Amino acid sequence: MARVTVEDCIDKVENRFELVLLAGHRARLLSSGAPLTVDRDRDKNPVVALREIADETITPDDLKEQLIHSLQKYVEVDEPEPEAVPLLSSSPAAAAVAPQAASGDDNDIQFDRMSEEDLLRGLENLAPPTETEDEGD
């Protein structure tokens, strides 16, 4: 009985392996309560699934999409474009405006920006710490 049904389905789905995947997925849907599109005739769910594919009451493309969706673990989410996200600017004008746009706390601290070269020159001009008696022993 199932062999005849498989032969009928080969016209709709050329690949037998894909047919097995689709029919198995449809059989699981039927066992979980999906409505039948053909009469059961005392057949089991895999045979009913093959008959549905053979009679074209459900399309293989729809089954394939449902199968792919059921196997997906992560759903792709569209994220905003990188240009849409405002970039922080390191210009002095932007640094002067940023604290004014902040919450307005009286304790806001503003830091001066300096280049890496200025920072290195400042570190070179620092005197090394003097040794104390505790460090010498």
From Swiss-Prot:
Superkingdom, natural source: Bacteria
GO cellular component term of the entry, any: DNA-directed RNA polymerase complex
TM stretches of this protein: none
Keywords in alphabetical order: DNA-directed RNA polymerase, Nucleotidyltransferase, Transcription, Transferase
InterPro entries associated with the record: DNA-dir_RNA_pol_omega, Pol_omega/Rpo6/RPB6, RPB6/omega-like_sf
Biological process annotations from GO: DNA-templated transcription
Region (Disordered) location: 78-137
EC number(s) recorded for this UniProt protein: 2.7.7.6
UniProt-recorded Gene Ontology molecular function terms: DNA binding; DNA-directed RNA polymerase activity
Low complexity compositional bias, start-end: 84-103
Biased composition regions of type Basic and acidic residues, renumbered to the chain: 110-121
Reaction it catalyzes: RNA(n) + a ribonucleoside 5'-triphosphate = RNA(n+1) + diphosphate
Family: Belongs to the RNA polymerase subunit omega family.
Subunit composition and interactions: The RNAP catalytic core consists of 2 alpha, 1 beta, 1 beta' and 1 omega subunit. When a sigma factor is associated with the core the holoenzyme is formed, which can initiate transcription.
Entry-linked HAMAP family: RNApol_bact_RpoZ (MF_00366)
Function in brief: Promotes RNA polymerase assembly. Latches the N- and C-terminal regions of the beta' subunit thereby facilitating its interaction with the beta and alpha subunits.
Protein name: DNA-directed RNA polymerase subunit omega
Native source organism of the sequence: Methylobacterium sp. (strain 4-46)
